Curated annotation (Swiss-Prot):
Gene name of this polypeptide: hscB
Species name: Shewanella frigidimarina (strain NCIMB 400)
Official protein name in the record: Co-chaperone protein HscB homolog
SUPFAM superfamilies associated with the record: Chaperone J-domain, HSC20 (HSCB), C-terminal oligomerisation domain
General function of this protein: Co-chaperone involved in the maturation of iron-sulfur cluster-containing proteins. Seems to help targeting proteins to be folded toward HscA.
Subunit structure: Interacts with HscA and stimulates its ATPase activity.
């Protein structure tokens, strides 16, 4: 299903999230199961299914990473259940450095400073990835779509690093 069509928004990486939220509320009002409480079982079931589609579409489009994946899936590139390994040597080296830094946090004399530095480093890197991704998603070239897929893979890795750093930070606060 094309969620951009469902929400009647222009297919783009940078979307108007306020407009998306407005369309979400409109669609929810139109298909909400309570509206069909006195209808046939088939209509009730259809309403539940449509509500699920609207909810899934909204969650997909409001999240930049999921939105980018959806854009690629509309072009025939599925990333949701893949196990493709990145072949970017520089990124792999950076991953190793970040992993080592995460492991060293608990042994640092000022762990919060290390955490703050990593958040900043992650943020800068993610910003660069998102800028590249936005540019690649504009292109109609299939090679650019494959490069966009690599950017998404990197961003997924960064999300995992963020989660791990947050867990470490929470553990230090306990």
């Amino acid at each position: 299903m094309n969620y951009f069509d469902l929400f009647n928004v222009v297919p783009a990486f940078d979307i108007d999230t306020a407009l998306l939220a407005e369309r979400y509320r409109e669609l929810q009002r139109a298909v909400h199961p309570d509206k069909f409480a006195n209808d046939t079982e088939q209509q009730k079931l259809l309403s539940v299914q449509r509500t699920a589609q609207v909810n899934d579409g909204y969650q997909t489009l409001k999240n930049p990473l999921r939105r980018a994946e959806h854009m690629l899936s509309l072009r025939g590139i599925e990333l949701s259940h893949e196990t493709t390994t990145l072949k970017d040597g520089a990124f792999l080296m950076q991953q190793m450095e970040w992993r080592e830094a995460l492991e060293d946090i608990q042994h640092n004399s000022d762990p919060q400073s290390s955490i703050d530095e990593l958040y900043e480093s992650f943020g800068e890197f993610e910003s660069t990835l998102l800028t590249k991704l936005a540019t690649l998603l504009i292109s109609d070239e299939s090679a650019d779509a494959l490069l966009a897929a690599d950017q998404i893979r990197k961003l997924k890795f960064m999300a995992k690093l963020h989660d791990e750093l947050a867990r470490i930070e929470d553990g230090l606060l306990d």
